[in-house]
UniProtKB/Swiss-Prot annotation:
Component of the acid-soluble and acid-insoluble organic matrix of prismatic shell layers (at protein level). It is found in: Secreted. This is Uncharacterized protein 7. One of its GO terms (cellular component) is extracellular region. It comes from Haliotis asinina (Donkey's ear abalone). Keywords: Glycoprotein, Secreted, Signal.
Length: 110
C-alpha cells in the first residue's frame, strides 16, 4: 500500500494540507467469504491479509475500519438499524417489539 506524506486518505481520495484532491488507486479488495480479511494486489503479487482484531474490511475506506465492541450493527431509528454487509451499511429492521441492543449485538425486547 502506498503512503502519501501529508495526506489524509479516506475512500480512495486524498486531501492534502493544500486542499488538493488526488485520486488514489486502492489495491485492496474484499474477500467474499470473510469480513475480517481482504485481498492485497500489487506488483509483487496477490495476498490474503487479516484485519486487526475488532475491525472489518471496507472497500469504501480502502482498509479495515473499527466496529463498536466488535458489533457489525448500529442503531438507526426506532426498530431500524444499520448492518455492515459486504462493505456497505444496509438498513435493516428488528422484529416488532424489539430494538437493537448494540452491547449484545442483537435485536432485544425493550
Amino acid at each position: 500500500m502506498k503512503y502519501l506524506v501529508g495526506c489524509l486518505c479516506l475512500a480512495a481520495i486524498c486531501l492534502s494540507a493544500g486542499a488538493q484532491r488526488k485520486k488514489v488507486k486502492c489495491n485492496l479488495y474484499m474477500l467474499k467469504r470473510s469480513l475480517v480479511h481482504y485481498i492485497s494486489r500489487d506488483r509483487t503479487g496477490t495476498r490474503v491479509m487479516p484485519c486487526p482484531p475488532g475491525t472489518i474490511f471496507s472497500e469504501g475506506h480502502c482498509g479495515c475500519v473499527s466496529l463498536t465492541n466488535g458489533c457489525d450493527m448500529r442503531p438507526y431509528s426506532g426498530r431500524k438499524y444499520k448492518h455492515w454487509i459486504h462493505g456497505k451499511w444496509r438498513t435493516r429492521y428488528c422484529p416488532a417489539g424489539t430494538t437493537l441492543n448494540q452491547s449484545k449485538c442483537v435485536c432485544d425486547h425493550a
